[in-house]
């Protein structure tokens, strides 16, 4: 008599491809961000050996910051600092400029480099308004100040001090027309570089030169 043995097929569960794709999609931006950060650091290291020119000295000034406290040349004395000119209701480039400025915080976090944003619409940009704007951007509040004050002083500071264009817009609702450049200032108050905040390599060049200054003028 012939005995037949029944065979049992064992199926291995198929991998959940949906989960794998979700994990992959989550990892892609993280890996991309890491690679871009690494590439920026490589560029910074290459550029940071170039000599820096001098463009004149920033005149003494005193304005008011987002906390309604006096802030100016005295508080910046002996520091390397970076300036920009913006206004909080800007319909044009200011959000990009401020975002790019915020990108400087992490790579310069232990350097002591100070960030300073001057409002070119001081009548609307009161300390209270600047504080709300600043809170959305600052990771280290003690290292980034937003300044307001008399229009005449800020206009003169932009045009005569930093050599940056500033004028009234053709349409009142569009606000002032101002420079989109970052300005690098050394410990002596001398301007050492200008950088287009809207250019793809603007932040990279600025970081490189800031690192150069930190070596040239250690604390």
Give a label for each model feature.
Residues 170-219:
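Thiol-/selenol-based redox modules, centered on thioredoxin-like
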Residues 43-75, 92, 99:
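N-terminal "domain-start" segment that seeds a small globular fold
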Residues 58-59, 81, 179-181:
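Short loop/turn microsegments at loop-to-beta-strand junctions
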Residues 144, 155, 162-168, 176-183:
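Structural micro-motif
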Residues 71-101, 115:
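Short active-site neighborhood of thiol/selenol oxidoreductases, capturing the structured segment around
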Residues 98-157:
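Structural microenvironment flanking redox-active thiols in thiol-disulfide oxidoreductases
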């Amino acid at each position: 008599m012939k005995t037949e043995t029944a065979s049992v097929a064992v199926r291995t569960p198929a991998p959940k491809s949906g989960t794998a794709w979700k994990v992959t999609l989550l990892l892609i931006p993280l890996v991309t961000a890491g690679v871009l950060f690494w590439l920026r650091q490589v560029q910074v290291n290459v550029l940071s050996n170039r000599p820096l020119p001098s463009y004149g000295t920033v005149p003494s000034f005193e304005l008011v910051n987002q906390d309604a406290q006096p802030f100016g040349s005295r508080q910046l004395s002996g520091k390397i600092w970076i300036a920009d000119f913006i206004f909080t209701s800007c319909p044009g480039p200011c959000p990009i400029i401020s975002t790019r400025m915020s990108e400087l915080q992490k790579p310069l976090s232990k350097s002591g480099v100070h960030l300073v944003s001057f409002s070119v619409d001081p009548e609307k940009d009161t300390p209270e308004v600047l504080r709300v704007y600043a809170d959305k951007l600052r990771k280290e509040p003690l290292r980034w100040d937003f300044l307001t004050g008399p229009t005449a002083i800020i206009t003169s500071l932009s045009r005569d001090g930093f050599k940056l264009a500033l004028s009234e817009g053709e349409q009142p609702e569009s606000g002032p027309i101002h420079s989109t450049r970052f300005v690098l200032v050394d410990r002596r108050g001398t301007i050492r570089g200008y950088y287009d905040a809207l250019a793809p390599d603007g932040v990279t060049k600025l970081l490189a030169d800031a690192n150069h200054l930190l070596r040239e003028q250690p604390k």
